[in-house]
């Protein structure tokens, strides 16, 4: 997504032609992808107060803080966008995960056992069949417990939305694959009567295929730009009350 020239141009236009004060992003990683893309688009904005980006991997969070330190308006948040127990329950009961064979055109991680894959990712539990990427993820996740006083926060997406509720916002959802739609649902519920801009990444993935369908078919959303090939949609939700 971060190398898509069409999206970069759309974000530049969004920053230039609007008065967005706050950006909320889920999934910082190391800060060199979508976070830097957003920062570059809005660095000249006279209205932007802060870009708030959420990362649960402590190693990535620490690296991102260094990588993004030259942007004085970026606030790197260490923690999870969701309540952990609610996220695990969601993964275990999500119809699209339980019956993923009904969606052959949608990408899903570890189609042989997606529930355990996503639950392991959220819980930090490992077993002999766990993918090496997940093992590395959990190893990094556990680092701050011994080496730092900082502890992860939870429910950060809801908290940040409530903090900036009455302000002009861009919300960017690009978090863990198994709970992307949960993030969309929370955003949609909290902001159901408010105007805001929304960017979804991975619309051809389990993460956001349902949110994308809602955006295309519900009258309170209007699409600014999208790419089915690269899997993103930038849209506007109008005020409804």
Q: Residue spans of the language-model regions?
A:
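A short alpha-helical cap/connector motif
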Residues: 1-199, 203-241
């Amino acid at each position: 997504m971060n190398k898509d020239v069409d999206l970069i141009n759309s974000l530049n236009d969004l920053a230039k032609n609007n008065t967005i004060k706050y950006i909320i992003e889920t999934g910082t990683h190391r800060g060199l992808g979508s976070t830097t893309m957003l920062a570059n688009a809005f660095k000249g904005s006279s209205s932007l107060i802060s870009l708030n980006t959420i990362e649960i991997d402590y190693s990535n969070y620490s690296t991102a803080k260094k990588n993004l330190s030259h942007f004085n308006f970026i606030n790197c948040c260490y923690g999870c966008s969701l309540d952990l127990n609610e996220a695990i329950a969601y993964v275990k009961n999500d119809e699209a995960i339980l019956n993923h064979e009904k969606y052959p055109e949608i990408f899903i991680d570890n189609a042989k056992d997606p529930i355990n894959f996503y639950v392991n990712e959220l819980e930090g539990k490992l077993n002999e069949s766990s993918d090496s990427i997940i093992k590395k993820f959990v190893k990094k996740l556990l680092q701050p417990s011994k080496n730092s006083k900082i502890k992860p926060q939870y429910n950060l997406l809801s908290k940040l939305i409530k903090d900036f509720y009455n302000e002009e916002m861009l919300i960017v959802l690009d978090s863990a694959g198994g709970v992307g739609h949960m993030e969309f649902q929370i955003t949609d519920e909290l902001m159901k009567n408010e105007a805001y801009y929304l960017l979804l990444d991975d619309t051809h993935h389990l993460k956001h295929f349902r949110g994308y369908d809602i955006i295309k078919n519900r009258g309170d959303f209007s699409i600014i730009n999208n790419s089915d090939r690269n899997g993103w949609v930038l849209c506007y939700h109008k005020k409804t009350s």
